Design a protein with these regions (language model features):
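Terminal processing/anchoring signals of secreted or surface-associated proteins
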Residues: 1, 21, 732-738, 754, ...
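Bacterial Sec-dependent N-terminal signal peptides
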Residues: 1-23
């Protein structure tokens, strides 16, 4: 450890020799036992106040407590008689994921502080505390007998690093007349003590929260978010060198373990989302170093929207996701309030990110580049577009990069004359310029909204481009729409149809329901799309859950000859299918259970020969209720009916439990209707005829509601399969529907890559009739 020892000679003389064993007077090793912490000197046990079960994770040595930033803290009663009033050392090992929120409305130019550890009573001028500000400033305050009670404060000359382990040490030495604050062994502040004794407090010690209570709605905002590994107090004045050597090089893992949600009926298992806290738009879907990556809007301090960071999850297969460390965090003058949405793109110089940097008064576009192929660490490269062009709304955000005709462009969401639009910025001579051009704009606020969020441009081939955008304040609220068109020589967009089309099938998406703000990426000949599917729950419920929102399953998209978007499930999802399966192939009148397939992670796939009456699936089924997806052959309407399901309602007003959409193309009598449904906790992704799709959030409350069935009210030929899904299941066939592909033949044999064998191989894995076998 590199330690700058700049203590005064007098203080050095008072210090014990380096390497001597030091006995603490207070020690928390931060091991969680039955939801509590033990102070090892007094053997006192103190409950961890927490909305969800208190958790420990791997620390520097042993365990560390995971503080969620909005609900959990410890209040401990320690006797002051055990502590010296002349010589003290307070030592903490911790790793902040983010800094305390303190203010949800704006970034604090004058920082306020939350207690990490201490029992400071400022009014009575007693006690001490190590504190951390909303901007990462460290502070140590202690009470002294000077002038019959005086508060001394040391402010650190360095900020506490985010996302890594650090050691904070505060040293008080009355005889040397010096107090010192250390960060990772380096002295970062001192003050004189006026040769006065320390005034201790009999008040409770707080760990992870200030003694005062500051809230935004139900959420505490003067709290610590991250890991605390160890807290110790010594009745000696020690330098960091005299404390036990600690290796701080390991990367802290801030992910909440699955046990945090063990009792949840709603937590998805194979949809992308962070391990806790708030997520909003996912952006920057890309591929690097053997993994898919999604970047997204994240508030780690709690499941509410404030001071957004760029979160990061990765996956090898688009269904088993791992959260990575925060990629980009506020901290520069231009993004002190938040790092908002943008995109990730790959150009001649490799992977880049551009994002919306927000201070308290202006939005700018900033570039960042990764430090590694895993895209874990990023370096900000500064402002590339310094605010909106003249004549546009102050709302200016969500940049997106594309290239056309040998030129590079960035479009940014905005509003012009009260209608949604996108600016156009061209890369010329090392700068992003705007000559007043608008990339594309709406013509009617009722249909096209007043502001455009999350614009996205995708080259669909044959000179056609897909432009998706999420307008605010349309006549039906927020939903995602799209145009198909061409790029003009000057970089502007010309649509091939005047009116936009809806991303989600048949108007299901309105008022902010359904899939919004898609991120699109092309790889291996596939164009993949996924987006945020908001839960539409009140903040009090998110407080109880510990998380807010998740993303859709990936969809494979393409265009038909009429420039309509075709959507079907990503074929790789078939690898989650377990051996728990059911099949029905017969003329059906009535209902048949799909047992043993049941639970909250299931796939239902059926082809129905259209005749008369209604047909479809039931799921979340119990003796007392169910969710029903049904197609009515008379009017061509597909309905998801939740009115008979015991649930936490999230759609009162817009839907009241009934999601109905007329199919764009009604199958004729004798034709096939294909329904493909993925259920995962509180989300259903529904695909129809491999053409149309929508995603819905559902929050069932009946623990026993796990059954599935297929039904038809009139005699209908059905060919149905169902599976229980498991994201941890290894292996991927690449073949999603051999069982119902007549052209494939009943006896064809495939390898794991989907290539056909002429005969059963002598060795290795092969697939016959949709099942895996191993020849040896």
């Amino acid at each position: 450890m590199n330690i700058k020892n700049i203590l005064t000679t007098a203080m050095l003389a008072a210090l014990p020799a380096a390497g001597m064993a030091q006995q603490s007077s207070v020690h928390f090793d931060m091991t969680v036992i039955d939801g509590a912490l033990k102070e090892s000197v007094s053997n006192g046990t103190f409950t961890i106040v927490s909305q969800l079960p208190a958790l420990s994770v791997a620390g520097v040595s042993g365990e560390a407590v995971r503080f969620d930033g909005y609900s959990n803290y410890v209040k401990a009663k320690l006797t002051k008689n055990s502590l010296s009033t002349t010589n003290l050392t307070i030592n903490i090992i911790l790793a902040p994921e983010t800094f305390p929120m303190m203010n949800t409305a704006e970034a604090e130019n004058t920082p306020t502080y939350a207690t990490v550890f201490g029992n400071l009573d400022e009014a009575a001028k007693k006690g001490f505390a190590i504190k951390l500000s909303s901007q990462g400033h460290l502070r140590f305050t202690f009470a002294s007998a000077y002038a019959k009670g005086y508060l001394f404060t040391i402010d650190s000359s360095e900020k506490l690093p985010l996302g890594r382990w650090s050691q904070i040490t505060a040293v008080l030495n009355k005889d040397a007349n010096l107090a010192a604050l250390y960060l990772n062994g380096n002295q970062v502040g001192t003050c004189k003590m006026s040769r006065s004794e320390i005034i201790l407090s009999e008040g409770d010690y707080y760990i992870g929260k200030d003694a005062t209570e500051l809230k935004a709605g139900p959420f505490l905002i003067n709290t610590f978010c991250g890991l605390i590994d160890d807290i110790a107090i010594y009745n000696q004045s020690l330098s960091p060198a005299q404390l036990a050597a600690v290796d701080l090089s390991a990367r802290p893992d801030f992910n909440y373990p699955p046990s945090r949600y063990a009792s949840s009926l709603w937590r998805p298992q194979f949809h992308g989302m962070p391990s806790g806290g708030w997520t909003n738009e996912c952006h920057g879907l890309t591929y690097s170093d053997g993994k898919y990556h999604i970047f997204f809007q994240k508030n780690a301090n709690g499941p509410y929207m404030a001071r957004l960071h760029w979160g990061h999850i990765s996956s090898e297969n688009l269904y088993k996701w791992t959260e990575e460390p925060i990629a980009i965090a506020p901290g520069e003058w231009y993004d002190i309030k938040g790092c908002w949405s943008g995109c990730v793109y790959d150009d001649d110089n490799g992977i880049n990110a551009i994002y919306t940097a927000v201070d308290n008064g202006k939005a700018r576009i900033v570039k960042a580049t990764p430090d590694d192929k895993g895209l874990v660490a990023w370096t900000k490269q500064g402002v590339v577009i310094d605010g909106r062009p003249a004549g546009l709304s102050d709302d200016f955000r969500d940049p997106y990069f594309f290239a056309s005709g040998g030129n590079k462009y960035i479009i940014v969401g905005t509003s012009k004359d009260g209608i949604g639009a996108c600016t156009l910025h061209k890369y010329e001579n090392g700068n992003w310029t705007n000559d007043g051009k608008i990339f594309f704009r709406g013509t009617n606020a009722n249909q096209h909204g007043t502001f455009w969020e999350m614009p996205n441009m995708t080259d669909m081939g044959n000179g056609k481009w897909l432009f998706t955008v999420t307008p605010l304040n349309t006549g039906v609220g927020v939903r995602t729409i799209y145009w198909v068109g061409t790029i003009n020589p000057d970089g502007t967009f010309s649509p091939l149809h005047d009116q936009p089309k809806m991303l989600e099938m048949g108007g299901i998406s309105k008022d902010g329901y359904g899939l919004l703000s898609p991120s699109i990426y092309q790889k291996d000949g596939k164009t993949l799309l996924l987006g945020i599917v908001p839960d539409k729950l009140p903040g009090e419920v998110n407080y109880e859950m510990g998380w807010a929102h998740n993303y859709s399953l990936p969809r494979e998209i393409s265009l038909d000859t009429n420039n309509n978007l075709i959507q079907k499930p990503y074929a790789g999802l078939a690898a989650m299918r377990t051996g728990v399966t059911a099949s029905v192939a017969q003329d059906l009148t009535g209902e048949i259970s799909l047992s043993p397939v049941s639970g909250r992670q299931v796939e239902l796939l059926g082809e129905f020969t259209v005749g008369s009456g209604e047909m479809g699936f039931d799921f979340f089924k119990s003796d007392n209720g169910k969710a029903r997806l049904s197609y009515n052959t008379a009017d061509g309407v597909l309905t998801l009916d939740l009115t008979k399901l015991a649930r936490r309602s999230n759609d009162g007003g817009p839907y009241n439990g009934v999601y109905a959409a007329t199919l764009p193309e009604k199958p004729a009598v004798g034709e096939k209707l294909k329904l493909h449904v993925f259920i995962d906790g509180s989300i259903a992704d529904i695909f129809v005829n491999d053409k149309w799709a929508y995603s819905v959030r559902i929050f069932p409350t009946a623990v026993e509601g796990t059954g599935t069935s297929v039904f038809a009210t009139s005699t209908t030929t059905v060919d149905v399969k169902a599976w229980t899904l498991d994201a941890d299941k290894s292996g991927e066939t690449g073949i999603s529907s051999i069982w119902n592909d007549p052209a494939a033949g009943s006896e064809r044999i495939y390898n794991a890559a989907g290539q056909q064998y002429s005969a059963i191989p002598q060795k290795g894995l092969y697939i016959l009739k949709g099942k895996k076998y191993v020849a040896n």
